[in-house]
Amino acid sequence: MYTLPLDSNELQELTTESINQTIIKKYFNESAIYLSYIGNYDTNCILTFGKTRDLTKFKIAVYKKRYKYFNIIALWNVIDDTLTESNISKIITDTNPQYNPYQFVFLPNLKPTKNIIVINRIRNLNYHIDLITDIIQKTKLFHENAPNLYH
């Protein structure tokens, strides 16, 4: 796993591009998951996640144009990126009762997706990084779908 040194009190650091293209290239041909900061809305930071296989130079350029920012803040090596992405999406939507992927459709160019994470005071950046790390570890150990991971 590669994570930026983050200070949870200084979310302005998220707006500066810190993970360089060399690190992204290293994870591109591997089975890996990324966590990326895409902007703010109403004092909440919005993140997205996905498989690094989907990140080509063209897609990164499109995402940077679509979102206010597209700054990758964490990368994890995984065994099965499709299963892991599905598990992360399922657990985040199940553990966050206020989660609504359609609440951000009014933001410019932001389409409803299961891969949106909202950072707030209770569920801050470190909480989500720890949660995703835990989901990845459980997926590696048990290699199961999300419903069985947290029972």
UniProtKB/Swiss-Prot annotation:
It comes from the Viruses. This is Uncharacterized protein R681. It comes from Acanthamoeba polyphaga mimivirus (APMV). The lineage of its organism: Viruses, Varidnaviria, Bamfordvirae, Nucleocytoviricota, Megaviricetes.
